[in-house]
């Protein structure tokens, strides 16, 4: 299967996030098709439109629909290049392959102010993970809306004095941030105490470029978002609180 082969290639090149997208997309296509055996001849515009309708009926967001369609389009185009499928101009024209904001991700000002206050003792007592989650969220906010993936993979060596230099996981772009005193204080409070670990925070334990570590990151991300959901509930916030909110709140300021 071309998609399976592409997934293995991504793993070999350490693109585990991309391989995860291909795997999720392929699973959705197989579920819709009812079989792993899918000929490229069957992938006509009627098939694509039906697949789009199927995804929406499964409550997939438009951005998820777009991700799956763009993945299928990439697989189809590779098949065309290898003369395994026919070239059809604008083959994916009538299905959604764009991006849209399905919901408002930036926090309301009142919610941000509530988050900035120390958690009431009756809330955080015995719930260190909730405190740590709140701290990570603020660090992401103060570090120019840093994505959770970059926070998780930060190394101790990335911080020299009050300067943090790191490379974006998604784009490879090198970024330098001068840390404010309050940011430094928060980092020192929650940084990794394991001297043998290269990571700045105790989020990951495995080697940087292994599939096991990527899976560990996926689990950490799900737990982080779950803890943020708990924070929203205990603080009675009106805004949606997720790993994206710190980034989008930074952009909206």
Q: Which role does the model predict for each range below?
A:
Residues 1-12:
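Single conserved hydrophobic/aromatic residue that forms the stacking wall/gate
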Residues 17-20, 33-53, 243:
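A Lys/Arg-rich helix-loop hairpin that forms a DNA/phosphate-binding surface
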Residues 28-32, 41-43, 57-91, 144:
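N-terminal DNA-binding recognition helix of tyrosine site-specific recombinases/integrases
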Residues 49-50, 85-120, 207-214:
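Flexible interdomain linker/hinge and immediately adjacent N-terminus
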Residues 93, 153-189:
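Conserved tyrosine-mediated DNA breakage-rejoining catalytic core shared by Y-recombinases
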Residues 112, 180-238:
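Active-site/catalytic core of tyrosine-dependent DNA strand-transfer enzymes
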Residues 121-127, 196, 225-253:
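Short, basic (Lys/Arg/His-rich) helix/loop patches that form interaction surfaces
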Residues 138, 142, 146-149, 247-253:
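C-terminal catalytic core of tyrosine-transesterase DNA break-rejoin enzymes
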């Amino acid at each position: 299967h071309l998609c399976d082969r592409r997934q293995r290639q991504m793993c070999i090149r350490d693109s585990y996030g991309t391989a995860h997208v291909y795997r999720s997309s392929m699973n959705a296509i197989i579920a819709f098709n009812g079989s792993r055996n899918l000929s490229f001849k069957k992938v006509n515009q009627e098939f694509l439109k039906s697949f789009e309708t199927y995804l929406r009926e499964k409550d997939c967001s438009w951005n998820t629909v777009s991700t799956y369609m763009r993945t299928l389009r990439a697989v189809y185009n590779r098949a065309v290049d290898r003369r395994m499928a026919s070239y059809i101009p604008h083959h994916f024209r009538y299905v959604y392959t764009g991006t849209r904001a399905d919901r408002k991700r930036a926090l309301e000002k009142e919610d941000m102010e509530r988050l900035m206050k120390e958690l009431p003792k009756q809330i955080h007592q015995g719930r260190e993970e909730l405190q740590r989650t709140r701290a990570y969220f603020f660090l992401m906010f103060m570090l120019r809306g840093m994505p959770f993936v970059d926070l998780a993979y930060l190394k101790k060596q990335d911080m020299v004095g009050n300067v943090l230099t790191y490379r974006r996981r998604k784009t490879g772009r090198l970024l330098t941030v001068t840390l404010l005193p309050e940011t430094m204080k928060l980092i020192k409070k929650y940084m990794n105490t394991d001297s043998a670990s290269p990571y700045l925070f105790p989020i990951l334990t495995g080697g940087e470029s292994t599939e096991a570590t990527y899976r560990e990151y996926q689990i950490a991300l799900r737990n982080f978002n779950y803890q943020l959901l708990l924070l929203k509930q205990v603080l009675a916030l009106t805004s949606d609180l997720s790993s994206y909110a710190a980034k989008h709140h930074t952009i909206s300021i």
